[in-house]
Amino acid sequence: MNSKKHLGHTARKRFGQNFLHDNNVIHGIVSAIYPQKDQFLVEIGPGLGALTEPVGELVDHLTVVELDRDLAERLRHHPFLHHKITVIETDAMQFDFGQLYRDANLAEKKQKMRVFGNLPYNISTPLMFHLFKYHDCIQDMHFMLQKEVVKRLCAGPNSKAYGRLTIMAQYFCQVMPVLEVPPTAFKPAPKVDSAVVRLVPHKVLPHPVKDLYWLNRVCSQAFNQRRKTLRNALSTLFSADQLTELGIDLTARAENLSIADYARLANWLTDNPPADVNKDEMIEHLDD
């Protein structure tokens, strides 16, 4: 028996496909999303429809973004949902969700998008950060991710899980774990445990920075040398006196600072940039 085949479709490794089939888990996720009839829901990576079907039954319309041509075609001809599904066959990493928001006239309707999905684990982090660019257009997001990634997203200061990913995610969103999911809930079963997370974009950013490049840069430099004191880890960006003036304990390490601390450092760097600035780095690359 082919462990990679489910409902007549063979999982494709290049798309990171693991199909959810546990009904208890599916019910738990749909309950967490709590879709309402007239809301604008967008599913990323619907796959074989494990979440698409129960969510689609509860709403007037559902938009799905699917890269796999065969799966997109199956959804277009779904036996009872085809009339209420819009299938966008494209790479979600390249898709303009802001244009989708505008095309649906959601601002006029005083609505925002609700996004959910069982994300391919190999692109989950950059995909989330692509979506954060559209945080003003999104009401909330529910994603299936690796359990370790969810721990990092939800972590607080002074913990091993706390890192650059934590700070950048919580800068944009309130982050809450929803439920844990064992490998047996998927076909083929992944080699890691999974979990569902809820991300709710802040209506007003609690710690706004003037330039996201500098928030990413200072977090990257601090956490890439997380065993060093900040005095040493950030020595190419700040002098010891400057850190002290900014209220930073010179003996602290990267995991000891709050998001507010990092935002303060980033805003200082925006106003006082070092001479050797290279802004070609991308915010999406956030593996600690």
Curated annotation (Swiss-Prot):
PROSITE patterns: RRNA_A_DIMETH, SAM_RNA_A_N6_MT. It catalyses: adenosine(1518)/adenosine(1519) in 16S rRNA + 4 S-adenosyl-L-methionine = N(6)-dimethyladenosine(1518)/N(6)-dimethyladenosine(1519) in 16S rRNA + 4 S-adenosyl-L-homocysteine + 4 H(+). Gene3D superfamilies: Ribosomal RNA adenine dimethylase-like, domain 2, Vaccinia Virus protein VP39. GO terms for molecular function: 16S rRNA (adenine(1518)-N(6)/adenine(1519)-N(6))-dimethyltransferase activity; RNA binding. It holds the Pfam family RrnaAD. It is found in: Cytoplasm. SUPFAM superfamilies: S-adenosyl-L-methionine-dependent methyltransferases. Keywords: Cytoplasm, Methyltransferase, RNA-binding, rRNA processing, S-adenosyl-L-methionine, Transferase. One of its GO terms (cellular component) is cytosol. Its EC number is 2.1.1.182. InterPro entries: KsgA/Erm, rRNA_Ade_diMease-like_C, rRNA_Ade_Mease_Trfase_CS, rRNA_Ade_methylase_Trfase_N, rRNA_adenine_dimethylase, SAM-dependent_MTases_sf. S-adenosyl-L-methionine binds at N18, L20, G45, E66, D91, N118. It comes from the Bacteria. Signal peptide: none annotated. Belongs to the class I-like SAM-binding methyltransferase superfamily. rRNA adenine N(6)-methyltransferase family. RsmA subfamily. HAMAP family: 16SrRNA_methyltr_A. Specifically dimethylates two adjacent adenosines (A1518 and A1519) in the loop of a conserved hairpin near the 3'-end of 16S rRNA in the 30S particle. May play a critical role in biogenesis of 30S subunits. This is Ribosomal RNA small subunit methyltransferase A. It comes from Pasteurella multocida (strain Pm70).
